Amino acid sequence: KVDAERARKEIAKAQEKQQEVQKFSSVDRMMNNGFEANRGRLPMPITGSYKIVSHFGQYNVAGLRGVTLDNKGINIMGGPGCQARAIYDGEVSAVLSYAGSVVVMLRHGAYISVYANLSSASVSRGQHVSARQILGTVGSEHILQFQLRKERAKLNPEAWLGR
């Protein structure tokens, strides 16, 4: 009798969780479908003229034989006063201070865009942003470190951005 009661409670709890997931998923699915449909056409995450100075993935360090590093995103150099901007509609999931700079993270359904090496942020956690909305000012050497993920999986941002 105790086992049957426990099983009933577990089933009720599982059904409740499933309903929550379905509610959340429909919004997520809409966001994902729109985001995925724009692969290769998303705007550059930096204002003004730019140059990609470091690409995604592993690379050999110049002058150091046998030393490789892994870039989790791309590094984009802009001009003086350049700003980071949202690549797609989303919600600010975090604004963090890290190693003397600011990092902004946006959630677009299951996708997350990360804007690092900012000197300041003009958005706050929980805020909804639109595509091309300014997120903050790019910091030292005018280099934005931009990352893109689908949940925890790192993606090559260059495959998603238009030129």
Across the structure, where does each feature detected by a protein language model lie?
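Extracytoplasmic/periplasmic cell wall- or extracellular glycan-interacting regions that localize
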Residues: 1-101, 105-107, 114, 130, ...
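Short basic/hydrophobic patches in alpha-helices and adjacent helix-turn junctions
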Residues: 95, 134-137
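Active-site region of chymotrypsin-like
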Residues: 110-122
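Acidic, glycine-anchored pre-beta loop/turn
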Residues: 121-133, 152
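Active-site loop architecture of trypsin-fold serine endopeptidases
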Residues: 138-146
